[in-house]
């Protein structure tokens, strides 16, 4: 599919600063708890709700929240689409999506359609069309959509970036890098 390219929008995606950022979490399996743990340490971030179809996982998220001295979040997850009820409550600024890959695009789109910024675990999409659906929804709704890629924010990566900015390598004419690990087994799970 060829994207419909045109002039850049005249308006930007700037969002007014929020005194408190109301956060929701979909998925408390492998990656969700690490995002929750990080948010619980940030002043001005409030954990409002957690959704997971696996009851022990959502209860674990609630326990993490109260153990950090924060109010217990509202829990969702009675069925695979209960996340929509959470989004429909209208009390979230941002939602972290840490679910199986095939849910990333529909959940991200549903969040942005409801005025909620979507922070999506990697990969944000598993098809090019899925990528474009996220981009187009973000542009249309003026809600941010961020893929939660962490590799480019590691100590080594930021050190190299700083060295480039300081001119340690001279004038850079071309750069190339890769981060590769075998994920074919995960792709088979969603086929």
Where are these regions (language model features)?
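The substrate-binding groove and active-site-proximal loops of carbohydrate-active enzymes
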Residues: 45, 121, 148
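N-terminal glycine-/serine-/threonine-rich beta1-alpha1-beta2 phosphate-ribose binding loop
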Residues: 1-116, 132-144
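A short, conserved beta-strand element in the Rossmann-like catalytic core
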Residues: 86, 119, 151
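Short alpha-helix within the catalytic core of nucleotide-sugar-dependent glycosyltransferases
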Residues: 129-133, 158
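Short, solvent-exposed turn/loop segments enriched in Gly/Ser/Thr/Pro and often Arg
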Residues: 54, 76-80, 100-103, 124-126, ...
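ADP-ribose/adenylate-binding Rossmann-like module
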Residues: 114-127
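Predominantly a Rossmann-like dinucleotide-binding segment in NAD(P)-dependent oxidoreductases
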Residues: 27, 144-146, 151-191
């Amino acid at each position: 599919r060829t994207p419909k390219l045109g002039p850049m929008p005249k308006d930007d995606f700037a969002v007014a600063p929020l005194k408190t950022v109301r956060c929701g979490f979909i998925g408390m399996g492998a990656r969700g708890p690490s995002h929750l743990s990080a948010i619980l340490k940030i002043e001005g971030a409030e954990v409002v709700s957690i959704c997971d179809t696996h009851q022990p996982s959502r209860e674990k998220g609630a326990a993490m929240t109260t153990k950090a001295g924060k109010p217990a979040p509202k829990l969702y997850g009675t069925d695979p689409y209960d996340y929509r009820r959470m989004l429909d409550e209208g009390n979230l600024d941002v939602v972290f999506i840490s679910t199986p890959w095939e849910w990333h695009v529909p959940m991200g789109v549903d969040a942005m359609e409801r005025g909620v910024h979507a922070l999506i675990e990697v990969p944000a999409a598993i098809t090019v069309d899925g990528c474009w659906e996220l981009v187009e929804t973000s542009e249309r709704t003026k809600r941010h959509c961020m893929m939660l890629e962490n590799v480019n924010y590691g100590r080594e990566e930021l050190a190299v970036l700083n060295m480039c900015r300081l001119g340690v390598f001279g004038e850079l004419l071309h750069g190339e890098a890769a981060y590769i690990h075998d994920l074919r087994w995960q792709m088979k799970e969603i086929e």
